[in-house]
UniProtKB/Swiss-Prot annotation:
Belongs to the MraZ family. HAMAP family: MraZ. It is found in: Cytoplasm, Nucleoid. It comes from the Bacteria. Gene3D superfamilies: Transcriptional regulator MraZ domain. Residues 5-52, 81-124 form the SpoVT-AbrB domain. Pfam families: MraZ. Signal peptide: none annotated. This is Transcriptional regulator MraZ. GO terms for biological process: negative regulation of DNA-templated transcription initiation.
């Protein structure tokens, strides 16, 4: 399980160094193989250990290519999916097209989200956190049954 937000830097080649606390788990669970794709709702990237990504691919394969909405989701997620192999120094090369989608330059936030990571431009991340907190403080929606059972 991945959790927490960590500031990391992209080098001039577009590589990020995976924090040490995640490396062993990524090597054990995925032999360092990561799949990176775009988030279709936010300007960030999603990084999945390969076994987790394969579950997503299976779900995507069950969608109908004849349904325009389902086809669009397949196209966006699969069309942007890029395999990244963690090197011996614990670095991942993020493809230029993916960096461009998320507006990644130098300082980025690696955010653990259970079975995957989100990768955000640092400034965009803090803006999103502020928007999320503001939305929660002024929320008028009723919590779903699952959220009502969540006690923090």
């Amino acid at each position: 399980m991945f959790r927490g937000a960590t500031l990391v830097n992209l080098d001039s080649k577009g590589r990020l160094t995976v924090p040490t606390r995640y490396r062993e788990q990524l090597i054990e669970s995925a032999t360092g193989q990561i799949v990176c794709t775009i988030d279709i709702h936010h300007p960030c990237l999603l990084l999945y250990p390969l076994p987790e990504w394969e579950i997503i691919e299976q779900k995507l394969s069950r969608l109908s290519s004849m349904n325009p909405v389902e086809r669009r989701v397949q196209r966006l997620l699969l069309g942007h999916a890029s395999e990244c192999q963690m090197d011996g120094a614990g670095r991942l090369l993020i493809a230029p097209v993916l960096r461009q989608h998320a507006g990644l330059t130098k300082e980025v936030m690696l955010v653990g989200q259970f079975n995957k990571f989100e990768l955000w431009d640092e400034t965009t991340w803090y803006q999103q956190v502020k928007e999320d907190i503001d939305a929660e403080q002024s929320a008028t929606e009723t919590l779903s049954e699952r959220l009502q059972d969540l006690s923090l």
